[in-house]
């Protein structure tokens, strides 16, 4: 059966610090905190995008480009999702009722976004949908990048050139960075600091 190629936005919202958080803390409380934060991301980001699946510490979403007529809507979604995530994480920490390592380590968690625009195919097997394609592979490869190494940021949004071009967003407020991957070559990306945007939204 031939599957139709679709074009649209691909978005990955990935909790930074997840691996060390789980490895160094009590798994029961870590699971509760992470589930709560993942639910927060899904609820917010799912208001505009279709959630494809949860990938451990990440939420993978997609949306046909026609469903987002203005690029600023996607940028606002990233802002609002990050705002909600940070607020909920701080609330969790403030209301923690124990001194376990998991509760103490909540402030080490952060959120990064990878945004791309490209082609994908929706595969359905036994009622389970999955996205396939080179651009799907690319966005997942981009989650392993040099942003934190180059900037010190752990909460950020990384957009590919294709993503920003489709959004028609001014690139002046972003830091340009090139990533390179085997079989995919060099990828032009643009990054913004979500901590700074969070402070701006909070009026700090």
Can you name each region flagged by the protein language model?
Residues 32-47, 65-113, 139-143:
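Alpha-helical scaffold within the catalytic cores of cyclic-nucleotide enzymes
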Residues 16, 118-120, 162:
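Alpha-helix/helix-capping structural signal
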Residues 1-80:
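Catalytic NTP-binding/metal-coordinating core of nucleotidyl cyclase/transferase enzymes
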Residues 63-69, 114-129:
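Catalytic strand-loop-helix junctions within cyclic-nucleotide turnover domains
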Residues 123-143:
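Catalytic-core segments of nucleotide cyclases and related cyclic-nucleotide turnover enzymes
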Residues 11, 110-116, 156-162:
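Extended hydrophobic secondary-structure segments that form protein cores and membrane-embedded regions
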Residues 148-204:
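Intrinsically disordered, glycine/charged-rich C-terminal tails and inter-domain linkers
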């Amino acid at each position: 059966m031939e599957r139709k190629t679709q074009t649209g936005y691909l978005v990955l919202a990935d909790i930074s610090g997840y691996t060390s958080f789980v490895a160094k803390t009590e798994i029961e409380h870590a699971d509760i905190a992470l589930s709560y934060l993942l639910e927060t991301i899904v609820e917010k980001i799912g208001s505009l995008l279709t959630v494809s699946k949860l990938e451990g510490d990440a939420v993978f979403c997609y949306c046909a480009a026609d469903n987002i007529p203005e690029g600023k809507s996607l940028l606002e979604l990233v802002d609002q999702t990050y705002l909600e995530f940070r607020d909920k994480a701080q609330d969790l920490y403030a209301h923690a009722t124990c001194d376990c390592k998991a509760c103490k380590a909540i402030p080490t968690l952060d959120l990064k976004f990878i945004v791309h625009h490209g082609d994908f195919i929706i595969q359905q097997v036994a009622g389970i949908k999955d996205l396939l394609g080179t651009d799907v592979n690319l966005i997942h490869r981009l989650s392993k990048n040099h942003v934190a190494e180059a900037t010190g940021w752990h909460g950020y949004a990384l957009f590919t050139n294709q993503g920003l071009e489709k959004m028609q967003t001014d690139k002046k407020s972003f830091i340009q960075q090139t990533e390179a991957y085997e079989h995919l070559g060099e990828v032009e990306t643009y990054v913004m600091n979500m901590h700074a945007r969070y402070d701006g939204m909070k009026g700090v």
